[in-house]
Amino acid sequence: MASMSFALNRFSGLSSKTTLSADFDPSSRRSFLPPTRVGLKISSAAESEPDLSVTVNGLKMPNPFVIGSGPPGTNYTVMKRAFDEGWGAVIAKTVSLDASKVINVTPRYARLRTGSNGSAKTDVIGWQNIELISDRPLETMLKEFERLKKEYPDRILIASVMEEYNKTAWEELIDRVEQTGVDALEINFSCPHGMPERRMGAAVGQDCALLDEVCGWINAKATVPVWAKMTPNITDITEPARVSLKSGCEGIAAINTIMSVMGIDMKTLRPEPCVEGYSTPGGYSYKAVRPIALAKVMNIAKMMKSEFSEDRSLSGIGGVETGYDAAEFILLGSNTVQVCTGVMMHGYGHVKTLCAELKDFMKQHNFSTIEEFRGHSLQYFTTHTDLVKRQKEAVEQRKAEKRGLKSDKDWTGDGFVKETESMVSN
């Protein structure tokens, strides 16, 4: 990708390590609450197609749909397929320095279906995995990153990285990954299972003191944009998000999977997924988690809007299956929307459906660009106390209107008799 480096301080709204594409337009910088333009569009023969392109932390993508870190980004072949099908960006499966310590088991997935336990033919609404990070040698993954960037120089490739609580190890991993030409880093502070004893993944993301220290190491070394991926398995997700941003991260990605036990087999009485008769809690994803993910994203977006400059980004994750699902995340402030389990369910070509549905939504509401509606729905969230107050005022207003006209200008010719009657007291 043809690019130029900007060395601007935080007051300019861009990090010193942000690399911008040559056609980056500073006027496209994000705003959480764009002007309200909601309303049905009147079709025109000359109407133009909505523009799905986004520029995030200086990285230009053809659309906001990003392959989330996981099985869909395990190797060169599948990541190439994602680019060929039209995904806006690809986040590779998480890598670490020593893949020999990563040992996966089979089976490692389990499904939740609608209906009673044991239903075999109903719709899948939830997905659990006990899969670890990449078990492929780091050298192999790095060669494939480099190959992808040579073949697709204008497409965005993001490396997901995770390492033990060791400054030297983190610095080595970041240095080696960046040498391949990847466009950004996503730091996995959120994997809910596997290797917690090595202080990896959620073991760091749930400890703000550790998180602050590790983010400091990473951001002192990194020269490309850094996104911190949040765990939902915490009381207040805005706390680690705030720490990550204060420590220098350009963006937040949320959420990773939710710690869960998928269920018990009613015949064997063993938990699922069952490996040699045993199991372990794993990460829960797909459609059923979307309401939880939306709430987490909403809270992070509101925090970011009130406390940080507009150059920081937010990548929404959790249960996205349709373009309309994606629109919900964007309406709550997300710059990009990640899809992982959805790709495992529908394949890489599903991005075409996602783009078509998102464009359909935009046409319905007369939106030309993503920025025109990003963050629009944040303004409608308030406290329960305020809801009570608003409803009380609305009820009083309706009662007042029933009691009669408020002003001479409110009289109408057609309803004159009824309007007169409405103001009679006996």
Swiss-Prot record:
Chain segments annotated as transmembrane: none
Subcellular location, record wording: Plastid, Chloroplast
Principal location class: plastid
Catalytic activity from the UniProt record: 5,6-dihydrouracil + NADP(+) = uracil + NADPH + H(+)
Superkingdom in the source lineage: Eukaryota
Modified residues annotated as N-acetylalanine in this record: 45
Residues annotated to bind substrate: 129, 188-190, 256-257
Any single GO BP term: uracil catabolic process
UniProt region (Disordered), positions on chain: 395-414
Description of the deletion phenotype: No visible phenotype, but impaired degradation of both thymine and uracil. Slower germination and 2 days delay in seedling development.
Induction (record text): Up-regulated by nitrogen limitation.
Keyword set, alphabetical order: Acetylation, Chloroplast, NADP, Oxidoreductase, Plastid, Transit peptide
Family per record: Belongs to the dihydropyrimidine dehydrogenase family.
Function (record text): Involved in pyrimidine base degradation. Catalyzes the reduction of uracil to 5,6-dihydrouracil (DHU) by using NADH as a specific cosubstrate and the reduction of thymine to 5,6-dihydrothymine (DHT). Involved in the recycling of nitrogen from nucleobases to general nitrogen metabolism.
Protein name: Dihydropyrimidine dehydrogenase (NADP(+)), chloroplastic
Native source organism of the sequence: Arabidopsis thaliana
Gene: PYD1
